[in-house]
Regions:
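RNA-interacting cores
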Residues: 1-218
């Protein structure tokens, strides 16, 4: 299940680095709950509809912006919806004006709606970030998907996820989150699996840290 949010923006400038503010909105709308600290079977996209203005170090939204929130558990989104109804204000003057439910897709090729983060644990609790062109990227992307399937109680052991850079724009990015520079991929992805598997990825996202704004797909 996925909610598409239509946001009012009257000439608003949103700083380039605003992902933490988006996470803050999600947590505000959730309120006290049992989801914090659990495996993040939800995802949310970047704000769209704006224009980058380098001189102002931000993104200009003339009239409106949109983004989506997806989750494998409908109760999660019901709580989000209640939170929005109680307090639709976001940040930088952005206000949610309308929420609609998006239809589920029936396909295997998807496109990024936020950068995809892949992390592999190294020695001394350090992590290596993998990018879409790395030789082990698809293996790690698939393992991550399998963990999400296990957490959601879906048995599809043959399911795979892979980057498909030839299907559209593919590039590397460096995303700052709380001062940490994350090497991430912006690339189409292909998911081979059952309809339930594809739906889980559509809602919960791919890769690591979907709960803080990475790995949403459309």
């Amino acid at each position: 299940m996925r909610l598409l949010l239509d946001v009012q923006a009257n000439g608003t400038i949103v700083p380039f680095v605003h992902q933490q503010k988006m996470v803050g909105c999600i947590h505000k709308w959730l309120g006290p709950n049992t989801w914090h600290g659990q495996s993040s079977l939800f995802s949310f996209s970047r704000l769209s509809g704006g224009k980058a203005v380098k001189d102002l170090e931000g993104i200009l939204f003339d009239h409106r912006a949109t983004f989506f929130i997806g989750a494998s558990n409908p109760d999660f989104l019901r709580q989000i919806l209640r939170g929005i109804q109680q307090d639709p204000e976001m940040f930088c003057g952005l206000i949610v004006r309308e929420v609609v439910i998006e239809e589920d897709p029936k396909r295997e090729l998807f496109y990024p709606a936020s950068p995809i983060l892949l992390k592999v644990k190294q020695k001394e609790n350090r992590y290596k970030h993998l990018l879409y062109q790395d030789s082990k990227a698809n293996e790690v992307l698939t393992l991550n998907l399998q963990k999400k399937l296990l957490a959601a109680g879906i048995d599809d052991r043959d399911a795979t996820a892979e980057f498909a850079p030839c299907e559209g724009v593919a590039k590397e990015m460096l995303v700052d989150y709380k001062g940490v520079k994350n090497k991430v991929s912006w690339s189409p992805v292909r998911i081979i699996g059952s309809p339930e598997t594809k739906l889980l990825a559509w809602n919960a996202g791919l890769g690591n840290s979907t709960g803080i704004g990475f790995g949403a797909i459309k």
